[in-house]
């Protein structure tokens, strides 16, 4: 799957991923009203609203982008109905030939980690048959429990030719409370980056490993260091746009070939219709997905321009 991601990035010339992280408050009123009229102000109604919201955004952007990243918590908050919306979103994005990164941040050990890996990336055995359930192409994983937590995911990645992105240096302000702690003269995130490179060394695609890393756009200097530590690992870069990251901050996340990183924007794209710059173009809540498409185009221009001028 890492090969497909690289190929899609090359074809679209867009090293970006759209984060499908829908809060109900983001959904335009006409969509929410229709869903509530049909299903009531219930978890099912909320799930239908966010599904329709996602579908419209995907329809407006799928030809421009290589991948999407649904954040499962935004769906889980609505219980089983929300997970149905998550599954519909994953399946629909696959119909559009998009790579799906499940932002699930799983982290456990042994059989529990294996069950997470099977559910999100592998096949579950039921009697004489096997099934792919959530069936994402990549999943985000928390490394805090060490190799015991990561190995079950790596094993499934090898078997299914899928991938993971391991949290290394995250974009949130308090990430340094642990991730910047010095151990033998080096910050913890560097040690984790070295383990990512080690875990990924024997599960390579054509150019990059199935085992990638999450490094926040809000920490460009750390990204520069980690790019050298993990030369064969793809970096998923959150924190662009709403969290403050800009194209000029991101050039060191990429290798000299212009590959090696994929930049996520969530609110900056899915809530673009609320921004004044798009309102000034005449975009309203009724045609919100047009703003999402324009935001994707602007993001591609920003990042491509920065890479061309580095």
Language model regions located:
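Conserved, mostly hydrophobic/aromatic
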Residues: 18, 68, 103, 139, ...
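Glycine-enriched alpha-helix->loop->beta-strand junction motifs that scaffold or abut catalytic
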Residues: 65, 134-137, 158-164, 207, ...
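Conserved anion-binding
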Residues: 104, 108-212
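A C-terminal functional module that forms or caps the active site or interfaces directly
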Residues: 217-264, 268-275
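C-terminal helical cap(s) of enzyme catalytic domains, especially alpha/beta-barrels
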Residues: 250-256, 271-310
């Amino acid at each position: 799957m890492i090969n497909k991601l690289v190929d899609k990035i090359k074809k679209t010339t867009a090293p970006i991923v759209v984060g499908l992280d829908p809060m109900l408050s983001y959904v335009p009123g006409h969509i929410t009203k229709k869903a509530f009229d049909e299903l009531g102000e219930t978890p099912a109604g909320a799930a239908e609203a966010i599904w329709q919201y996602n579908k419209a955004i995907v329809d407006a952007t799928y030809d421009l982008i290589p991948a999407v990243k649904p954040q499962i918590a935004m769906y889980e908050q609505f219980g089983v109905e929300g997970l149905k919306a998550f599954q519909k979103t994953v399946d629909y994005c696959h119909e559009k030939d998009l790579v799906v990164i499940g932002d699930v941040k799983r982290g456990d050990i042994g059989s529990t980690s294996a069950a997470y890996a099977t559910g999100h990336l592998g096949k579950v055995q039921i009697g004489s048959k096997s099934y792919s359930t959530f069936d994402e192409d990549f999943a985000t994983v928390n490394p805090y429990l060490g190799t015991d937590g990561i190995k079950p995911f790596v094993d499934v990645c090898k078997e299914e030719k899928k991938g993971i992105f391991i949290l290394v240096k995250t974009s949130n302000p308090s990430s340094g409370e642990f991730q910047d702690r010095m151990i033998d003269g080096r910050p913890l995130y560097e040690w984790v980056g070295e383990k990512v490179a080690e875990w990924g060394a024997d599960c390579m695609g054509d150019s990059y490993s199935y085992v990638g890393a999450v490094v926040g756009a809000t920490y460009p200097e750390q990204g520069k260091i980690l790019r050298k530590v993990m030369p064969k690992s793809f970096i998923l870069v959150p924190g662009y746009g709403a969290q403050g990251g800009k194209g000029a901050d991101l050039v060191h996340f990429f290798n000299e070939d212009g590959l090696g990183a994929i930049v996520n924007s969530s609110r900056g794209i899915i809530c673009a219709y609320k921004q004044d710059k798009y309102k000034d173009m005449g975009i309203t809540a009724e045609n919100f997905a047009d703003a999402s498409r324009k935001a994707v185009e602007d993001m591609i221009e920003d990042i491509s321009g920065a890479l061309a001028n580095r």
